[in-house]
Amino acid sequence: MSYINKKSSWLYILVAIMFVVVGVLAYALTLDRSAPKIIVQNEVMGKDIYWNLQNPIKIDIGDASGIKSYEVTFNDGQSQINLDTKVVKEDQNSVSLEISSPKNSEFLKATNGTLKIVAFDNSKWNFFKGNEAIKTTNVIIDRRSPIANVI
């Protein structure tokens, strides 16, 4: 009689484990796996940004599950300057940024570099870390005014 109780208890444990596995798989399939979309409005043909350091660079970050945080850095090959970092407290599906040039003299010496934008969304994927999107764009700093001649 005790052998039958042990056998049936193992059966109940096995059925419970199966329900847990099915539940975890069903939950994992509902998670958002798409990375946030990063759009830089000043890009020329999707590659380079020509920046005169007077007008801000406009960046749009969006995702269906909401934006958790973002970071914008400029690297000129010798130094890395953090232009903007924020942890978004409200649940926003899109964030619009205007990145202005910093006033430090190190940044003003650069003639080109790369702009790196990293964004995380509110998804529970990656062990609640969220999905990550990284966009790197070349920046050409153009301080010269155009020369126009009237004939």
Question: Which residue ranges define each predicted feature?
Answer:
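N-terminal Sec-pathway targeting helices
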Residues: 3-19
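Flexible, low-complexity linkers/stalks enriched in Thr/Pro that connect modular domains
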Residues: 29-36, 41, 127, 135-149
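Short, solvent-exposed loop/linker segments at the N-terminal edge
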Residues: 46-53
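Short edge beta-strand/loop segments characteristic of extracellular beta-sandwich folds
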Residues: 55-63
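Solvent-exposed loop/turn segments flanking beta-strands in beta-repeat/beta-sandwich domains
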Residues: 63-78
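Aromatic sugar-binding surface patches on proteins
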Residues: 89-103
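Surface-exposed, short loops/turns at beta-strand junctions within beta-sandwich domains
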Residues: 103-112
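Conserved structural position at the C-terminal beta-strand
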Residues: 117-121
